[in-house]
Amino acid sequence: VKLFHVADVHLGRRRLEGRLPDSDLADAFGYVADKAIEERAEVFLIAGDLFDRPMVEPPHLRQAQRILGRLKASGIRVIAIEGNHDRAFIHSEEPTWMQFLAEDDLLVLLRTAFDASGAILTPWEPARLAGAWMDYGGLRFVGAGYLGAATPFKVRQLVSQLESDKTHVLLLHAGPDYFVGEGGGFSSSDLKAINAKTCYLALGHIHLPMRYGDWACNPGSLENCDVSEARYNRDLAGAPLPRGYAVLEIEPAQRQKPVDLQIRSNPRRPVYRLTLDCSPFGNKIKDGAIALVKAAVDIIRAAEASPDSVIDLRLTGRLNLNRIALDPTSAAIEIQEQAEVFAVTVDLGGLDVASSLTGGELAARGLSREELEKAAIREVVSAKHLWGIDDREEDFSAFCYELKESVRKEKSGAELAEQIGSSPLLELIACSGSAIAKNGTPLQGPSEEAG
């Protein structure tokens, strides 16, 4: 049986304050669907977060209907679970748009309920369009979905009830415990328990590609849901890292693992992560900002960025706020226009900011305190010598500031957990602390630079 596996499509995701088109996400999804049709796949798995929000807007619903309709017309069975973005609350009984698609006969939605005695594994019934599992092509597909903080406990309950004489494919929207906070991740011992009863574990939730041996896989997000995810295109050694979707073949009689498993990359909008040292411009009384913009345009042109590219520009060096006041939003727009690229985002987290201005003077000049706050965080981080992020204090300081801003904006716990879990800094800390799977092949993660 040939299967395609995607996760974290996030149709409707708003990126760079709406400057990037949401059609990027649909195009990536459509590309993989067309590949599945071309290669005559029999099953198409969606391991959660087809949509970015529980409240789906009509254009994004139409995107899903159109692409899923192509799969249906080609006779490919789509089997899906819901992720944390697909429904408002884990235990909510409110109808979801994933249910709507199931009622429209565009996918089979699997859900497992739990009570005090454990998992309730009911077969999927066409009359109810509901159930925890279904048999198809000699395989038994089981949908665990997103289980939140109780993931380890509930997954063990579920797999303990799986029949040993069946070849199981388990769909789970979760990641390893060193990436997922709030106790919602699985450990290497959890994976061993799952592997004892499962031929293939189809994962989602963490947006970078991960693989455990030859039987468990998270293919990563199809498109960059955040520009920073472009760093996931390379591994820790700097080698290209396939990311986007998984293709596998399972022989039902061979229950231990798939016959073949590959993670493949799909086309996505190019992102260039570039660094510019601002020190030469930081003390210029006149034309400092103009010189900085020109230098940024020069390095973008040197990178031969195409017109459809996004530039993730990181500024470093020392910048004297008494001499040059830089508005990152205005600078990004000006750089974008002069470099003739699709979008530019300017990250000030790596700047060493010098200023003798007081808070009142900063306010009077219309300057944000962001640069000064990051500098203060950086000073504390440098003094602490945090294990695993040596020489990355600036990145860690920027991450702490962004997390503080997310809390200030009252983002949900799930959104904060995703923000923390998607940071490549956690991968560095995890590697330094040997926080990798102790049994089998280590889970492979991202590099710090994009390809």
Listing of model-derived features with the role each one plays in the protein:
Residues 251-254:
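Short loop/turn segments immediately following beta-strands, especially the blade-tip
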Residues 43, 54-69, 74-249:
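His/Asp/Glu-rich metal-coordinating catalytic cores
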Residues 30, 158-159, 223, 393-397:
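A structural signal for the main folded, soluble domain(s) of proteins
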